[in-house]
Each structure stands twice: as structure tokens, then as C-alpha cells.
């Protein structure tokens, strides 16, 4: 099986290692791990700029944790893979709410307060409250709710119909 995309590499990484250092970009870390799968990366280096670590918690899933070991958020999963970063951010989940985090630092940049959220594209994302996820077993989609478009800082650009 060939692992070409960043999310496929993240899946491989999570399967192979329970935690990892966020000292390089995630992409650089995935490449490093693919080059040497036996390499052991420590979670938090003393001089690291980064404040978070990915950790696979058995029977709970993949979490981003802080230096104290607190669960901060979970990456949002789409099509059975962690969400890919777009426009410098990726979707996150805190409880049942969706927000966005910076792809390089892991810092939350838009609070997890939405029930539904599409990835950013060209600097904006459609997000909704009061919407619900429906599925046919293979595909899923959101229905209902109030939707708005936001910029990468979380500011409302326009009200919108469901995308």
C-alpha cells in the first residue's frame, strides 16, 4: 500500500506511533517517519516552539494534547481520514462542535462552536449551527441549520444558504 497524501501518512503515523513531536510541520514529520519507521520521536522537546502533540489514545482515537497531557481537541475526520489542511487551517472537533486549528502550530484559531463546517477554500468556509449530519451508511451530508461564510479569522463574511 502506497501512502501518498498527508492524511494517509498521518494514518500510518498514528498506527505506528502513539505520540509525536510537533517540532517540524506535520508534513515534514510524516516524511521523516516514512523514511525511518523505526525512529522514535519524543513528544515534547524542551526547546520546541510547539505546545501540542498528537497522541493515539486506545479506544478513544487521535487527540491533540498539551504539555500537561490534557486532551485539547480531536482532528475532524472526513472520509475515514483526518481532515487535510486548506488555507493554512484544518477542522477540529471539541465534543460535538467543530472549529479550526493552525496547520503548523496546532493552535486553535477559530473556536469550536459550529455544528457543521466545510473546509476553507479561497479564504472562506461555510459553517452552520443547528444543522445535523445524516448518512446512508456510505456517504454523509448535513441538513438544516443556519449557515454563514467566515474568513480564516472567524469573522462572518456573509449569511448563506446551505452550501
Regions from the language model: what does each represent?
Residues 11-19:
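Bacterial N-terminal signal peptides
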Residues 2-11:
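Bacterial N-terminal signal peptides that target proteins for export
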Residues 2-3, 18-21:
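Position-driven detector of the extreme protein N-terminus
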Residues 24-163:
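Residue-level detector of conserved, function-critical positions
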Amino acid at each position: 500500500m502506497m501512502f501518498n497524501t498527508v492524511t494517509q501518512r498521518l494514518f500510518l503515523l498514528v498506527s505506528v506511533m502513539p505520540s509525536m513531536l510537533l517540532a517540524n510541520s506535520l508534513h515534514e514529520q510524516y516524511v521523516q517517519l516514512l523514511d525511518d519507521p523505526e525512529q522514535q520521536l519524543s513528544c515534547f522537546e524542551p526547546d520546541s516552539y510547539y505546545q501540542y502533540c498528537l497522541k493515539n489514545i486506545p479506544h478513544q482515537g487521535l487527540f491533540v494534547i498539551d504539555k500537561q497531557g490534557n486532551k485539547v481537541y480531536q482532528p475532524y475526520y472526513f472520509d475515514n481520514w483526518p481532515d487535510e489542511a486548506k488555507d493554512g487551517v484544518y477542522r477540529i472537533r471539541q465534543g460535538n462542535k467543530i472549529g479550526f486549528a493552525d496547520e503548523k502550530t496546532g493552535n486553535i484559531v477559530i473556536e469550536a462552536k459550529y455544528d457543521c463546517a466545510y473546509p476553507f477554500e479561497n479564504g472562506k468556509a461555510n459553517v452552520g449551527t443547528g444543522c445535523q449530519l445524516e448518512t446512508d451508511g456510505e456517504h454523509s451530508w448535513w441538513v438544516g441549520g443556519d449557515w454563514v461564510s467566515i474568513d480564516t479569522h472567524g469573522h462572518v463574511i456573509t449569511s448563506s444558504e446551505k452550501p
